[in-house]
């Protein structure tokens, strides 16, 4: 949407470098000038049906850049202003590693757009002292999961588990139409509760609304099933549109500026939010292990998909040759 708006705000002679004159002139500009919501509906319709040059935006950042003649390296720029994409097929940074260390980078890897995960920034931005929030987070998610601002530590398993929790919980929130900016209720303003919230509240909420019994563990499982479906669909999409279903190499590649910014600092020195390349590869290994994804390709294994009653998706991945991209011996050796 950001790129669409930038093009359409350009003067006609500039915009028609990216879309044809006929397409530009066919747009219902009277609706746009009048603030008529049909303007947005028409733009969305054209993108959904692949009509015109502008519709490439719906295919993601990589396809858009290819069409407009921009190399992938354009997103490696460390200019601090016009480039903030964390991944090459992602969206300008919104709640990533600058606020949530490796956890923020990991959960961004799952999506093709703004991941809209606020589970960490709601804690870092709560106004509570660091030591108070750290105690709450570590009691819920394990020692070492929560870093101080601009004082990051190397990846550990609890950070990877927290990232996976955030992804699954966000996918549940999307399905339940709950606001991820408010839920889950991780912290409490109550001193008597030692500022601990109640992660079970959303399960209680679901139970009250539906009349069926829900638990937090059950919601995590339901959210992870969605995560696995999304990941399998992403592999199919990348195979069809990018010619490769190796998600680790293509989809989960991180732009250089994340590691190269603030050159006066090294990663893990106090005063910077930059990440370390080798550390993030280790983080991916831990993250993939938690989700049951092949470490070489980042694709859910057949065993993982069948665990979530998604054997039909595993059959589809196999039929498309997506599982064939990793030699059996290499997978077993891992």
Predicted segments — roles?
Residues 1-334:
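Extended C-terminal regions of large enzymes
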């Amino acid at each position: 949407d950001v790129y669409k708006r930038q093009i359409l705000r350009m003067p006609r002679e500039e915009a028609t470098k990216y879309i044809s004159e006929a397409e530009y002139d066919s747009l219902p500009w009277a609706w746009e000038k009048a603030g008529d919501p049909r303007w947005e509906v028409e733009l969305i319709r054209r993108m959904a049906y692949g009509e015109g040059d502008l519709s490439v935006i719906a295919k993601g950042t990589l396809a858009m850049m290819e069409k407009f003649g921009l190399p992938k390296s354009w997103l490696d720029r460390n200019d601090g202003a016009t480039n903030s994409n964390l991944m090459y097929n992602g969206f300008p940074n919104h709640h990533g590693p600058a606020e949530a260390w490796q956890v923020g980078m990991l959960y961004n890897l799952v999506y093709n757009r703004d991941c809209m995960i606020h589970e960490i920034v709601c804690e870092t931005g709560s106004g509570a002292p660091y030591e108070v929030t750290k105690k709450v987070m570590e009691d819920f998610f394990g020692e070492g999961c929560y870093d101080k601002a601009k004082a990051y530590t190397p990846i550990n398993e609890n950070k990877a588990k927290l990232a996976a929790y955030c992804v699954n919980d966000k996918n549940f929130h999307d399905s339940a139409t709950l606001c991820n900016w408010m839920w889950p209720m991780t912290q409490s303003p109550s001193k008597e509760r030692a500022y601990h919230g109640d992660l079970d509240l959303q399960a209680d909420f679901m139970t009250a609304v539906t009349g069926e019994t829900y638990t937090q563990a059950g919601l995590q499982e339901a959210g992870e099933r969605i995560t696995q479906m999304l990941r399998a669909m992403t592999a199919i999409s990348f195979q069809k549109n990018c010619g490769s279903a190796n998600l680790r190499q293509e989809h989960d590649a991180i732009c250089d500026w994340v590691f190269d910014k603030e050159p006066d600092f090294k990663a893990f020195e106090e005063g910077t939010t930059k990440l370390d390349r080798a550390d993030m590869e280790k983080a991916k290994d831990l993250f993939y292990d938690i989700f049951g994804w092949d470490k070489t390709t980042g694709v859910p294994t057949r065993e993982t998909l069948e665990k979530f009653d998604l054997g039909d998706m595993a059959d589809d991945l196999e039929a498309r040759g997506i599982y064939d991209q990793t030699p059996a011996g290499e997978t077993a050796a891992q």
